[in-house]
A protein has these predicted regions:
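N-terminal presequence-like segments and the immediate start of the first folded domain
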Residues: 1-58, 62-75, 81-114
Length: 114
């Protein structure tokens, strides 16, 4: 069996320990990353939606960096949206700043109700 190694970004380990999950798991050459949200360092939600998207990507970046990875290493993204029609522009603005040149990752966006 392949060894699994838990990965945690600096400063947020208590959040994961409290809820009993890992920010990411490295297994062989693969990194499996838990879902990321636009929360502040203390875990509270950011009220401004575009800033919330930025924080989610910042949190993802921190997790990737803790594993020695970058956004260029991502091959597949699944995102969940509570109001896609009104959120799409803000999401695309931030996404396009991060992924500004090919090859782009696969991306599946799913509209959900909460």
């Amino acid at each position: 069996m392949v060894e699994r190694t838990a990965v945690f970004p600096a400063g947020r380990h208590s959040l994961y320990a409290e809820h009993r999950y890992s920010a990411a798991i490295r297994s062989g050459d693969l990194l499996f990353v838990s879902g990321q949200v636009g929360s502040r360092e203390d875990g509270t939600p950011e009220p401004d939606f575009q800033q919330q998207v930025r924080l989610a990507f910042d949190n993802l970046h921190a997790t990737l960096a803790a594993a020695g990875c970058t956004f260029d290493d991502i091959i597949d993204v699944t995102s969940f949206h509570t109001d896609p029609e009104n959120q799409f522009e803000d999401i695309m603005t931030v996404k396009n700043e991060i992924y500004s040149a090919p090859p782009y990752p696969n991306w599946t966006a799913v509209g959900v109700t909460w």
